[in-house]
Structure formats: structure tokens, C-alpha cells
């Protein structure tokens, strides 16, 4: 995709985005934030700092376990079966025409089938449908597969944070 080009509309009828209900969210939110802590620690952050950052974001974005205004959590559904999740939201301090992929994951049993690409194409279409002109995300350095996918979809690096243990 060339710079400035709009992504093509998402047309794959097999993968659907379905809002998660309260029961699903009650299980998904704590599990997702626990996974987030592990990812932060894998990127070199201490357990204490990772938990503190996770708790602060959870309180801000899911007060009482419910998505705050502007936050949307959906199941990736393939042929009637939930195969992953997508969390879209307004970026913290972002503009009205921007949306942020806070979380996207295809369940392990369904990986390697192109569903990650389909999920991101669906996220792009969702963003356009919701008035967005830009989509952004964070990817941890150790997630080489996801970084390759995002590169192939035309995402560009905005900043890089690096560390070295001594």
C-alpha cells in the first residue's frame, strides 16, 4: 500500500467482529491484563512496574470491568466459532480521526491460517466505518511474527524503545 492510500474495504464474509457481552468481558479483561503484564516483563520491565502500569490502564480503560466510552472489545468469529479477540479504542490523548488496536489475538489453535491478517483488515475497515483515518498499535519487540504482519500491512514505526540488561 502506498503512503496515503486508503486500505481496501474488508470483504471476507467468513471472519466477523462480534461485540463481547458482559459475561465474556468478566473473564477476558483480567486474563488480557495479566497477559499484558507478562509481555511488559518480557520487554524488560520489572514485575512491580508492569503490574502497576497494567492496573492503572485497566482502571482507566475498563472501570469496574466495563469498557470506558470509546473502547470496543469484539470476538473474532469464524463460521460461528470465536477464534480470537480484537480491542479497538480511542488512543489516549489521540485525535478524533485515530483509532488504536489495543489488543488483537488469534487463538493458538487457529494460527497460521491467515486470520491475523484478516483480523487486521477487519480492524482497518472498522476504523474507516467509525470515521477514522489512522490506525495505530503497539507491538513488543519480541513479537517477531506480529511485527512482520504489521510491516506487510503497511504499518510504519513511529518510535522504538530499546534496552540492554547489564
Predicted regions mapped to residue ranges:
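Residues that form or flank phosphate/diphosphate-binding pockets in enzymes
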Residues: 96, 114, 145
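Short, Lys/Arg-enriched N-terminal segments with co-localized hydrophobic residues
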Residues: 1-13
